[in-house]
Amino acid sequence: MFHPDGAYSGFAVDDLDAAHRFYAKTLGLRVEVLDGSGFLTLHLGSGGRVLVYGKPHHQPASFTVLNFPVADVEAAVDDLRERGVETKIYDDADFPTDSRGIMREGGPLIAWFRDPAGNVLAVLEE
């Protein structure tokens, strides 16, 4: 019988080792390696989880695959940049952002960044 209660999302990467290092060491998430499966599980502080899997000929997602809600986007961007993460990834014609990559108009304050596979992630102020 189908039960949607435990649903979670997933996305592909081209290098599981690089993804493991980035999500565990750079972002500080708890990352579980699913033995022999070629899958990682990202454990989020909210109790949620995300499946990450290796895919040959991976093409980065052209949309945001994972959003991290934060109380203060400015502080989150400072923290990410101190960890070596680039937050200015879009041309202003696509999404008008300031020099630090924060979009300040048309919705919540948000800054996008990429994982080592090129997938788009974001911090957004709630």
Tell me what each language-model feature is.
Residues 30-64, 70-71, 88, 106, ...:
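Conserved short beta-strand elements that form part of the metal-binding/catalytic scaffold
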Residues 18-19, 37, 75:
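Short Gly/charged-rich anion-binding patches and loops
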Residues 22, 74-79:
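Short amphipathic alpha-helices within nucleic acid-binding modules
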Residues 1-20, 63-66, 124-126:
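N-terminal beta-strand motif that seeds the catalytic metal site of vicinal oxygen chelate
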Residues 10, 37-39, 110:
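A short, glycine- and basic residue-enriched loop/turn
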Residues 1-2, 68, 77-126:
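Vicinal oxygen chelate
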Residues 17-30:
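Amphipathic alpha-helical segments
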